[in-house]
């Protein structure tokens, strides 16, 4: 709960990347993407309920999805700190989209997976992100995460060589999507 009724955000941490509203509106695809969002930017007035005479909120919709880079989850000044949820590194307007629970959940899974993999590799999250981002992305896909624009590239994954069929399917959502690592768009 916010510290002021009617506000939907609290503190934000500064990461190695700050996601902006321009990136969201452009449906940006980042090379180090580990999560995604698609909720409209829901901007609430800074004063909350106390802001009399102001429009309480403004919604900016956009088509498609955007990706959230790893740098939004890694602290920019504390080497061994990661964040997830409503405190990721994003501008105030970008936070209007990233703060919804579905987006927070996929980001939390990415941050948790990265922290575990970094610990196993004996690296800080920041160092891990510089050298192991592809490995992290492939692990997230293997764990049934969706990252727009990324496909399963794991040569050891037998699903890549498998053949899938179904008696019926929705156009564009055939059984082959299960094998590609892109099961939903």
Each predicted region: which residue ranges?
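Disordered, acidic Ser/Thr/Pro-rich linker "stalks" and the adjacent N-terminal cap
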Residues: 147-185
């Amino acid at each position: 709960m916010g510290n002021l009724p009617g506000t939907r955000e609290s503190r934000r941490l500064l990461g190695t990347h700050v996601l902006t509203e321009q990136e969201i509106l452009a449906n940006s695809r980042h090379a180090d993407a580990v999560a995604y969002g698609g909720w409209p930017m829901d901007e609430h007035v800074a004063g909350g309920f106390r802001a009399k005479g102001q429009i309480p909120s403004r919604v900016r919709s956009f088509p498609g999805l955007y990706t959230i880079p790893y740098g939004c989850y890694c602290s920019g000044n504390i080497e061994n700190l990661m964040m997830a949820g409503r405190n990721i590194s994003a501008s105030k307007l970008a936070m209007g989209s990233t703060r919804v629970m579905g987006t927070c959940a996929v980001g939390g899974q990415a941050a948790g997976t990265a922290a575990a993999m970094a610990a196993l590799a004996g690296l800080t999250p920041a160092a891990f992100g510089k050298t192991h981002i592809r490995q992290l992305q492939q692990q997230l896909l293997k764990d049934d995460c969706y990252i727009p624009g990324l496909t399963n590239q794991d040569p050891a994954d037998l699903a890549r060589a498998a053949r899938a069929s179904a008696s019926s399917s929705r156009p564009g959502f055939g059984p082959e999507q299960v094998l590609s690592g892109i099961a939903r768009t």
